[in-house]
Amino acid sequence: MTSERMTPELAQRLSLAEQHDWFRRATSRRALLRGGLVGAGTLAAGPALLGGTASASTTASATASASASASTSASSGPALLPASDIPSGSSVVPFGRHIAYGADPTTQMAVSWQVPTAVKNPFIRVGTSPWDLGERIEAEVRALTTLRTDVVSIDNVDPSASSTIEQYYLHATLKNLKPGETYYYSVGHNGFDRPKPSFATSVKSFTTAPHGREPFTFTAFGDQGVTYDAVATENLVAAQQPAFHLVAGDICYAEASGSGLITDPYDPRIWDAYFAQIAPVAAEIPWQVGVGNHEMEAWYSPDGYGGQFSRFAFPTPNTTYFAFSYGNVAFISLDGNDVCYEMPANRGFTADAQTAWLEKQLAGVRTAGIDFVVVYFHYCAYSTCVNNGSEGGVREQWVPLFDKYGVDLVISGHNHIYERTDPIRSGAATSAAPIGATVDPATQGTTYVVAGGAGENLHKFSAADSYEGGVDNISGISSYINSAGGTKVDETVSWSRVRYTGYCILRIDSKPASRGGTSTLTVRGLKEDGGEIDRIVLTRRAG
């Protein structure tokens, strides 16, 4: 694809922000769209909920793809379609529900969904009983417009005769909830209101994080896509009954090449399919997404994330990196595009602000009650996969901080395989950690896991697989590091302990101990049929 005849060669020479500026200048010359493109709407706070206040987020974050002049104000509400063009609400069925924690998982939950066309007065109902969901709480509309001329249909189906593709994302961030409480909810709009559990597909539930130190399970993967195998890994996630799920980037592959170029193949309708695919799981299990290279979409905003800020309710609004805590574990999600040499479209876009924020988080994270620190992001600090190797930008900017502050576990994707390292410090393995080993991160270093086998086409290793039931220990594996200027620096490594070419997820169980005892974090790799391919136990003295 070329956008207004931008050549691929020109796109490769421009940063993502420069491409977006070029695109905005080009499209501003077009006569477009019902008097201007829709940006995003805002909301008012909802009524009191169970002794607190449940309110919807008021951040307007969707960016129109050609003109920001038509974004709506708080006083006027979302400007969607003329009333005469809005179909009957009863015929418009919400789909693609997914939830995520707010800034405080003990008291906040964001509920997001989609409608196929504009609706009037979208809302959520929430209560502690499926039979009593309470009053309506107004939801925020974030409308996203994509020019038909900027779409290369990935499945070769003409999206429509219209000049644009319109997508309507709805969000409500519930606040002042009670810790450790199960809530029930339904979503709707004028003409569509199904608040009773007799509508089995309409009423869903979620549970806020508890106060204190209780055992819990979470899951993780990266590089999912919209495939049969992606459905299988989602079902495997659901079978673990996790408190929440981490996604290490490359979510649905609507942006097909992942280069962050405005000439890349792109079909936003893939997002519709993705949200419909994950809804049976993500409507009740918080889906904590990080971004990868396939989330850089140059059409909506200078940083490429306008589309993501429309689709997802990030814990920190309009920011692709964030932190949260659950029980005795602190979690940090990073945007690897900011430091990446391999896919440089967004390299340096935060001007080192993210790395400074990371150090501040790590310096203060081990407060009373936090035993383990888990960091997740897309690119691999350490991997021997031949497709993408290791990312030098991560090693240069973030790994020294992981060493300095004693990060326990790092989870990545990007390479579509499973791989686990021995514990690493200062770029080298400190000791062997075979399957079933116990690792003390305080003395041995950080364990790195690549869990990128969530559903997209699988990648390959140069060495043989080695996993539970098929161990093949090999030393001296040839690999490479992506470095400055698109170069690849060869290296021979001994830290690759477990390698598995197949679809998989991570299951991680936290078992806190009383103060002075030994807390454990059991890390297990599970293949698509649920069988175990890897297991180690990380230990820390409980604070």
Indicate residue ranges for each PLM-predicted region.
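Histidine-centered active-site/metal-ligand motif
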Residues: 170, 293-294, 378, 414-416
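Metal-dependent phosphoesterase/phosphodiesterase active-site architecture
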Residues: 14-19, 72-123, 128-134, 138-142, ...
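Short, locally clustered residues in the helix-turn-helix/winged-helix DNA-binding domain
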Residues: 37
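Divalent metal-dependent phosphoesterase catalytic cores across multiple superfamilies
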Residues: 77-291, 295-320, 351-353, 359-363, ...
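N-terminal secretory signal peptides
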Residues: 1-27, 43-45
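Residue-level detector of secondary-structure transition/capping positions
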Residues: 40-41, 191
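N-terminal twin-arginine translocation
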Residues: 21, 25-34, 42-76
